[in-house]
A protein has these predicted regions:
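Aromatic-lined carbohydrate-recognition surfaces of secreted/lumenal glycan-active proteins
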Residues: 136, 203-205, 250-260, 293-314, ...
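Active-site groove signature of glycoside hydrolases
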Residues: 93-95, 101, 109, 137-140, ...
Length: 420
């Protein structure tokens, strides 16, 4: 940008600034000149000449002195009043007389949960529930709209400024896509599990894009051929080293140590695929399972039964598990049903097999709605989970968090929050 131009960046979905709290700002810049940075309200960042209304008296002047290379500059702000506004954001202005390139503009509160970047009140809400494990990073994002947009855990670690940005499956619009910066990546998820005393349960892509969106997933845009599957299996093997490895000559152990965590995370579970189903899935899953069990026999592997509580894909999955129970420690079931369905199916697991190695992991479940009746129906259903704890070894309500006014998914959510 050239003087007297600048940029105004609204904090994503707005933010709350608290009087007396500190906020760490950073920017990567290239060139020689001055940047003036302040906090304020962005009236309309889409205008060619945007309007801003500063609310913090203190502004910072950053002297940029790297002509040819990118350099990171940082400054800390202390908010001098309270502000919660839809337009709250960062104003960066070039006050010098030369061109400057800027990238990776960041503003983070210093007061976060255990100093690891996550919002303290949300983590404290989660902590109060005494969770035993966390399934991450979620569901369909792992699969991707196509294989090119599938989540790759290796893109989500290391310096945040160097992580590969990726389109999110929940809004893949070509004109207004929802992008993932991977600022919350696998390292942060492992760290979150450690901070909250949870077992990490990462889910990896199995070489198949989202089957719900792609139908039969028969072309290479959506389905990795068997003779090209090995890199995906290697990703799983490398993740085990990243999480559990102690050999400091290993590339992925080195990366974990470089990020500040010398000790292993002691991961015990890995899920292969999110809601995949059918013969094309189990053909690929078997290759993952054989190689992982051969090298890391103590890792518990999670397979999946698809997207429904019953039907052909669910039946096929359990029939496969009955014949290959040595390859799967958990069967991940997902279903979102009506409140009446949950009330009527409290006895669902009474007749499941008990003499098999493959136990149930109810990885996603919720009744469709957010009324008291939904909660009561789910509670009734959960009595069946507890009664059959020898069959249902793990269960996780989903989704975990939802922000008021900013959800794509409204069928059910566990913890609702706003800016404050």
């Amino acid at each position: 940008m050239t003087e007297p131009n600048g940029i105004a960046i609204k904090v994503h979905l707005s933010a709350e600034f608290k009087n007396g709290e500190k906020y760490d700002f950073s920017v990567y810049a290239r060139g020689e000149g001055e940047l003036t940075v302040s906090l304020g309200i962005v009236i309309d960042e889409h205008k060619a000449s945007f309007e801003v209304e500063p609310f913090n008296e203190a502004a910072a002047v950053i002297k940029c002195n790297s002509k040819d290379d990118w350099k990171k500059y940082s400054v800390t702000f202390t908010a001098d009043e309270e502000l919660e506004s839809d337009g709250s954001g960062i104003i960066v202005t070039n006050t010098g007389d030369s061109d400057l390139d800027v990238d990776m503009v960041s503003l983070m509160p210093e007061d976060t949960y255990k100093g690891h970047g996550l919002r303290k009140d949300l983590m404290e809400q989660l902590e109060a529930m005494h969770p035993k494990f966390l399934r991450f990073p979620g569901g369909c994002a792992v699969e991707g709209q196509t294989m090119d947009t599938a989540w790759n855990w290796k893109d989500t670690i290391g310096d945040v400024s160097e992580r590969k940005e990726m389109i999110n499956i929940w809004n893949p619009s070509a004109t207004e896509p929802y992008m993932m910066t991977y600022g919350l990546g696998f390292y942060e998820y492992f760290q979150m599990c450690e901070d909250l005393g949870m077992e990490p349960v990462p889910i990896l892509n199995c070489g198949i894009a989202c089957q719900v969106r792609s139908g039969s997933a028969t072309d290479e845009e959506h389905l990795v051929p068997m003779d090209k599957l090995q890199p995906y299996i290697d990703d799983a093997l490398d993740l085990i080293e990243f999480a559990n490895g102690t050999d400091e000559s290993n590339e992925w152990v080195q990366k974990r140590i470089q990020m500040g965590h010398k000790e292993p995370f002691n991961m015990k579970y890995i899920g292969i695929g999110n809601e995949q189903y059918g013969d094309i899935y189990f053909e690929r899953y078997e290759e993952f399972a054989k190689q992982i069990h051969e090298k890391y026999p103590d890792i518990n592997l999670v397979t999946t039964s698809g997207t429904a509580s019953s039907g052909s894909s669910n039946d096929l999955a359990w029939n496969w598990a009955n014949e290959h129970e040595e390859l799967a420690d958990r069967m991940d079931e997902h279903y979102y049903e009506t409140a009446d369905w949950f009330r009527q199916h409290a006895y669902r697991y009474d007749n499941y097999r008990r003499d098999t190695n493959t136990k149930v992991f109810l990885g996603e479940y919720a009744s469709k709605g957010n009324a008291w009746y939904n909660a009561l129906s789910e509670a009734a259903f959960m009595t069946g989970l507890e009664r059959n704890a020898d069959v249902v070894r793990m269960a996780s309500y989903a989704p975990m968090f939802a922000k008021y006014g900013n959800t794509q998914w409204s069928a059910a959510d566990m913890i609702w929050f706003n800016n404050s």
